[in-house]
């Protein structure tokens, strides 16, 4: 049974996740002050340390600068053929919509069209558009070109992107319609994450996915993304690699079937810059960063992600639960529960078959989801979650 629900604008919910103490309002929530006046079970105060910004952050603005960031494109025809195989698999290509992000010279675009696929190319650089449009000639597939940066589409909250691009308007013009979450994959997206903004983009997509916003309004959109080895290792991390296991790994693995497809050497890619050459930054080597092998990862949203107890209406509380537990990852999980929830932690842990001494670092992604859903369906208390009121977070 779900308790009373109190909702805040998305800005507040996201702000709560991006900062220190918890400020979550959701299904069945009460302030810590109110709860402590009623507390009769001896709950201890267990204040967590805020997560570092590199792990959990709001998608802060990264709008267009005066100089465009370098972009990588497929430059090898053999690599393009392999990607066509990975993207189309054994499906009828004419029924599959492929959204290609920043195709550049169109090496992969041409290979997809030759295979008979329907391709929507989202190209941010005007320079490449005249080279993409003629590709449809003498091809079996269908091509539509959209001049926009896919990764900056549907900016969240206070981000300002020019031009302001809405997936809803674009998809409507393309004739793409939403399908139920329980249906198959309606759209596949292929892209190469910008090396300077990989983590930020992955977080932005996570919020879109759990809230069913942006491209996820249209169903279980499948991502096929080239990422750096660093982010790849973190995406697939488990408790067996505590040095890499973080909040992002839990949230992605709960939401999606994350599958490694293959590694592609850096020589398969070309690099485009606005001024035609790469410049070394003050602290690093831009050239060396771009000359790294990339890992192709498929992220397919799970049909079973949303349940009666985890939905786009309360996902922010789930995010907060995971964040809280990783704030002190080596503390017993029972201590986190006593700080997070009003329900009996011993009873909850017994139901999910976990020991009170188990730590967040030893819990697998599915354990966190099971823990959250068990608390949500508990009838021990009307108010299931405790939050701290933070006036500085109550901003739009």
UniProtKB/Swiss-Prot annotation:
E.C. numbers: 2.1.1.-
Keyword check for DNA-binding: no
Region (Disordered): 43-71
Main EC class the enzyme belongs to: transferase
Assembly notes: Homodimer. Component of the mitochondrial transcription initiation complex, composed at least of TFB2M, TFAM and POLRMT. In this complex TFAM recruits POLRMT to the promoter whereas TFB2M induces structural changes in POLRMT to enable promoter opening and trapping of the DNA non-template strand. Interacts with mitochondrial RNA polymerase POLRMT. Interacts with TFAM.
PANTHER family attached to this UniProt entry: DIMETHYLADENOSINE TRANSFERASE (PTHR11727), DIMETHYLADENOSINE TRANSFERASE 2, MITOCHONDRIAL (PTHR11727:SF13)
Family: Belongs to the class I-like SAM-binding methyltransferase superfamily. rRNA adenine N(6)-methyltransferase family. KsgA subfamily.
Name listed for the protein in its UniProt record: Dimethyladenosine transferase 2, mitochondrial
Natural source organism: Mus musculus
